[in-house]
Every structure is written in C-alpha cells, then in structure tokens.
Amino acid sequence: MSSETVSYFSHPFPRRQSVGVSVGGVIVGGSAPVVVQSMTNTDTADVDSTVAQVAALHRAGSEIVRITVDRDESAAAVPKIRERLERLGHDVPLVGDFHYIGHKLLADHPACAEALAKYRINPGNVGFKDKKDKQFADIVEMAIRYDKPVRIGVNWGSLDQELLTTLMDRNQAEGAPLSAQDVMREAIVQSALISANLAEEIGLGRDKIILSAKVSQVQDLIAVYTMLAQRSNHALHLGLTEAGMGTKGIVASSAAMGILLQQGIGDTIRISLTPEPGGDRTREVQVAQELLQTMGFRQFVPIVAACPGCGRTTSTVFQELAQTIQEDIRRNMPLWREKYPGVEALSVAVMGCIVNGPGESKHADIGISLPGTGETPSAPVFVDGKKVATLRGPGIAEDFQKMVADYIENRFGLGRKIAS
C-alpha cells in the first residue's frame, strides 16, 4: 500500500494513494480531503419530501447525497428532484442507490441516468446465476455512456453467495483451513475486486470506480478495508453498516473509521446512524464532520472546548453557555461560510473554574473562564492569548456571546479586509 504525507491542519499523516474520482465535481480520492456524504430515508418518488431532506443534508454540510432508486416511480422522480434542488441553490451530487433492477431502471429512464452523479451497484444482488454478469455489465455500460462513476458497494448482508460458497469449499480442502470469519472477510474483498476488474474490462476507467465493503462489526471493518487498501488503489468509501442508534452507532462508527483514517485509509465517509423516531437525519452529517475535525483532518465549524464539570462547578452556567455557543455556531454556519471565509478555524473555550479555565481560554482564539463554586463571581475573557476583559453580573453569558460575534466580525469580516 503506497502512501504520501498529506497535511490537514498542522498534523501530517500517511495518506494512502488512491485514484481520484469526480462525483458531480466533488473529487473523491487522490489528494482531495476526505469527503462527507449522507443518504436520505424518504420515498424518492415523493419529490417534495426528498428535496426537503436533501436540501437539509446539504445545508448541514453533506458534500454528496445518496437516494434510493428502487422502482419506476423513483427513477422518474430523480430529474425533478435534481431540477428543484438546483432552483433552490443546492448543487449537490446525487447518487442513485440501485439493487436488483438497476440495469432496467437506468435503461428505461434515461433522464434519471443523466441526472444522477454516480451509480451505486451491489455485486451481491445486481443479478443471479447466469444473469449476474450481464446485468452488472448493463449498468457499467450505462455509466460509460453517460460518463458517470460507479460505487461498487459490497455489503455482508447481501454478499454474493456463490462466491462465498466457493471460497468456503476451497478453504475446507486446505490442510490448515481459515476460520469462517476470515473466509467471510476474504469473500467481501474478492467480491469488490472481482467486480472492479470486470468493470475495467468492460471499459470503465479506474478514475470512475469507488469501492466499499461494509460490515457491521468494528474489527471486521478494519480488517476488510486494510485488505482492500493493500490490494488496490481504488478510491474507498468507508461506512459501518447497521451501526445502530444513538451513542452506540456514533461510538462504533467513530472507532472503526478513526482507526482506518489514522492509517490513511478512506476517501469518503458516511456515518450510518439509525435515527430515532422523528429524529433529525442531519445528525449523521454532523457526526462525520466532527470525526474528521476532531482527528485534525478537516475544518468544518469553529471548535468549542468546554470542561466536563466537577465538584468545583456546581453552577450550570458554563454548561448552558457552551451549549448556546455551539448551537449558535451550527445555526449560523451556512451564512458564516459565505460572509466570514476562514471562520471554520475559530476556536472558542467555555470553562467552568479557575483550575484549568484561564489556561484553556488562553489557548483558544477567544475564551472565558467562568467562576466555580466559592470563587469570585467574575469571568476573565481572553482573546488571542491575552486577557481583554472581566465580565461580572447576571449578563455574563450575553456579554460573552456579543464578544464572540464581534471577534468573528473583526477577524473574518469586512473590517479585516478594509484594515488589510
């Protein structure tokens, strides 16, 4: 596995060299930063709800959005969705997720084939027995005709059973057979690589192919992607399938992908969270961004550092202020990205007592150290490492919020440009 040293922030890390793929103008792989993507859970045939969700995901920061294309009505809706999104100013690449009848839907709906930025093919259900290679080839030829990339997405829940059986039988004939788990991992990797080789034989360029091999267990995911990275230079899409709900899904996805990303493996990621009933679908985008930003690979939103609290911080003021600042940042980022270029690099500290508060606040671009239990009811504020004010009274939170807003305007806004 060849690698190069790439620097995001100030931290170099070994980045696996892969072939870059353009997905609707968004580069995946090569020397491009790791791309964040997401998937809708609406009925694609429902144009209004799908447009609304894609727009929300794009506003949240998703750089590519995948939609289900499972029947004629869904395929017919895709061009309408694309057109409506463009009218709303959301020029985000749409990926068509095809299973079982993708070859037929693309052939019957040329406007859908044209509107999509990428096709996802699952080798495990693209076709069965003697129809498998033909139907796979049909989709690849469609991608060539419309100049679209494909993601060959293997999933262990729908793995090619003929391939798995062949490898299991061959393994049993060996003198020292591998475990069933190892054979399963090998089958997943081979399914992706065999399909990629077939696509290239048909005429699809390597710069049009992205691979993924999704499983639901952390150690399996690490093993499978490590094998893929060692045996090919295709761009890789990372994702832990069926990660689950809430903190379990976040922790599992972050643990698996964090290890792979630190090794330089992975060109685009999706955090597959099961949303709670009525939950916000954009949560998966936020988690993906926070994973990449926490590891120092990309910058998306200003970082708010806050202490966890202890017996010295019985007041909830610092917790409420940290939450308010974080929510305010998330809410304003779509506007700030346009108005304040570079604001993503901002760091804010909201600390709860005198022990670490002043020191942490000095390390941030702007920080406040609120009084802990029994401390003098005052809050020093630090800007660029220097103490600039001491806030007192019931309006500390509001005063600090205004100072943050003023700092952003002065550092990233029009005032900075005029001064320079």
UniProtKB/Swiss-Prot annotation:
The keyword Iron applies. It comes from Brucella suis biovar 1 (strain 1330). Belongs to the IspG family. Binds 1 [4Fe-4S] cluster. Converts 2C-methyl-D-erythritol 2,4-cyclodiphosphate (ME-2,4cPP) into 1-hydroxy-2-methyl-2-(E)-butenyl 4-diphosphate. This is 4-hydroxy-3-methylbut-2-en-1-yl diphosphate synthase (flavodoxin). It catalyses: (2E)-4-hydroxy-3-methylbut-2-enyl diphosphate + oxidized [flavodoxin] + H2O + 2 H(+) = 2-C-methyl-D-erythritol 2,4-cyclic diphosphate + reduced [flavodoxin]. [4Fe-4S] cluster binds at C307, C310, C353, E360. One of its GO terms (molecular function) is 4-hydroxy-3-methylbut-2-en-1-yl diphosphate synthase activity (ferredoxin). Its EC number is 1.17.7.3. Keywords: 4Fe-4S, Iron, Iron-sulfur, Isoprene biosynthesis, Metal-binding, Oxidoreductase. It is an enzyme of class 1 (oxidoreductase). The keyword Iron applies. One of its GO terms (biological process) is terpenoid biosynthetic process. Its cofactor is [4Fe-4S] cluster. Pathway: Isoprenoid biosynthesis; isopentenyl diphosphate biosynthesis via DXP pathway; isopentenyl diphosphate from 1-deoxy-D-xylulose 5-phosphate: step 5/6.
